[in-house]
Structure formats: C-alpha cells, structure tokens
C-alpha cells in the first residue's frame, strides 16, 4: 500500500539525513563519525532538518557569492 511505501521511504530519508549530519559534525569538530553519532541520535528530527537546511543554505550562498564576484 501507499502508506507502507511512504513510511519506508521516509525512514530511509531520516537515516540518510542522520548519517549526513554526523559526517558534517565530525568534520567540523575534528572527531570520528562514531563519536558524533550518539549526539546526532539524541537530536530531534527538527534539529537534524535544521542542520541539513543550514548546511545546504551555506553552500548555495557561497555559490551565489562566487557567481556575483565574476
């Protein structure tokens, strides 16, 4: 059914977002992904989404700035 497909896709997306945020935080803090993973697992879904939005927002802003300088 559509419900089970949607839940499955949503769970996979949440898992991928958690992995991405852990990777970014580990890089930022200079720690291993495993060390940061517990902190990420304790975060709410809203906090994780905010990390994803801010990360991609910064990238978009940097690209826009570069294109305006040229």
From Swiss-Prot:
* Domain writeup: Both the N-terminus (1-33) and the C-terminus (38-70) of the mature peptide form alpha-helices which probably disrupt target cell membranes. The linker region (34-37) probably derives from a processing quadruplet motif (PQM), found in propeptides of many zodatoxins, hinting at a fusion of two originally separate membrane-active peptides.
Q: Which domain of life is it from?
A: Eukaryota
Q: Name one GO molecular function term.
A: toxin activity
One GO-annotated biological process of the protein: defense response to bacterium
User: Which keywords are on file for this protein?
Assistant: Antibiotic, Antimicrobial, Secreted, Toxin
Q: What is this protein called?
A: Cytoinsectotoxin-2c
Its localization reads: Secreted
Tissue specificity: Expressed by the venom gland.
For this chain, the family text in UniProt reads: Belongs to the cationic peptide 06 (cytoinsectotoxin) family.
- Outline what the protein does: Insecticidal and antimicrobial peptide. Has insecticidal activity against larvae of flesh fly S.carnaria. Has antibacterial activity against Gram-positive bacterium B.subtilis B-501 (MIC=1.25 uM) and Gram-negative bacterium E.coli DH5alpha (MIC=2.5 uM).
GO cellular component annotations of the record: extracellular region
